[in-house]
Amino acid sequence: MNTPCPCNVLMLYPRFTADSVWSFAESCKLMGVRRPAAPLGLITVAAMLPGSWTVRLVDCNTASITDDDFAWADLVFTGGMLPQQADTLRLIELCRSRGKPVVVGGPDPTSSPHIYAAADFQVLGEAEGVIDEFVAAWESGVRSGVFTAPKFQADVTKTPVPRFDLLNIQDYLYLGVQYSRGCPFTCEFCDIIELYGRVPRTKTTPQMLAELDALYDMGYRGHLDFVDDNFIGNKKSLRLFLPELADWQRTRDYPFEFSTEASVNLADDPKLLEMMAAANFFGVFVGIESPDPATLVAMKKKQNTRRNIAESIHKIYGAGMLVTAGFIVGFDKL
């Protein structure tokens, strides 16, 4: 059996553009933090790397990269979403100018790999399905290449607890965890089903409670966001998880207040609303997109066309949860 080689990995989380909805610069100033949320993707990948590899994280939204960071690093990981594209490209060029091999991955490189051709490595798709292949190649001496995970096949029940220890927690308004990937709906404008598929895959209850235990043991308290794109995508699994989550909260005197994203059909399930409230969910982001039924039909937002949206929102309010509404302004006229 080959012995894993030591490797120093510098993970760089790119800056969001200032005009992006993900920036929240003024809100962060008001709340006395540097960023709303921490980089969950990179710290999850960090947990998948060999134990002989050492990881250092720099969130470029909250801190600057130092000469010592580059001198220490054998390899750089970066990548993110579309609003981070410009800074990701800047970081790739910066790494190349310092003679450091750079690995790029994440949603935007997976969707548009040609834009990131300057990176030494592209690791595309969900990390669980490809990271071991990349690590083996690196340790065998490969110094460039494209590694692509099979689509929609990552086994999230094998995903390790993220490396929360890499974060400067005080920099963030809240932290995040992920329960599921994928969404059963087919909204025309959304890339989630292109990245993760239409069959939501969920972690196990012991996995999720292990993540909460890790945060609790670190001393973290307060707002914790389930970053799932549709938390109720797999209701069958969720109904099994929520009572265990509520029990976990109750035995620890409710250390966390949860938020998440869900489709508006959450309002159709009073029992599910009750279970979320019992687990101490206080807020849900709901994509309303448009009040115009014709526009909703055109964007294939079927779940919003079958109801009185205002009444649905008030049902969620009635369960004791705030609703943050998402709208698309200037959608194509079809």
Question: Residue ranges of each PLM-predicted region?
Answer:
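Acidic, low-complexity intrinsically disordered segments
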Residues: 2-220
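Residue-level marker for beta-strand->alpha-helix junctions and adjacent short loops that shape enzyme
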Residues: 16-17, 83, 109, 129, ...
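Short Asp/Glu-rich motifs
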Residues: 67-68, 114-115, 235, 295-296, ...
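Catalytic cores of alpha/beta
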Residues: 113-118, 271-273, 333-334
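Radical SAM [4Fe-4S] cluster-binding motif and immediate context
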Residues: 160-331
